[in-house]
Amino acid sequence: IGMVVECKDGYLMGPDGCKRGCLTRPARYCPNECSRLKGKDGYCYLWLACYCYNMPESAPVWERATNRCGKGK
């Protein structure tokens, strides 16, 4: 009997609704943050934002369709 686990990839999102930046962060910042949220791995995309792989469906990731960065709460 198999079990299907839904996962998603995407940019980590901060409490302000913006992508989580990584330009001035230590090298392992993004992989550590992705792991903390139960993602498999991650990296600093173009030294601008953390991108994570295999995140649980419940993890908040930035999406263009629901972008609220810079738009208040």
Swiss-Prot record:
Disulfide-linked positions: C18-C69, C22-C44, C30-C50, C34-C52
Function, in words: Beta toxins bind voltage-independently at site-4 of sodium channels (Nav) and shift the voltage of activation toward more negative potentials thereby affecting sodium channel activation and promoting spontaneous and repetitive firing.
Residues with PTM Lysine amide: K71
Pfam families: Toxin_3
Presence of the UniProt keyword Amino-acid biosynthesis in the record: no
Protein name listed in UniProt: Toxin Td10
All copies of domain LCN-type CS-alpha/beta, residue ranges: 8-70
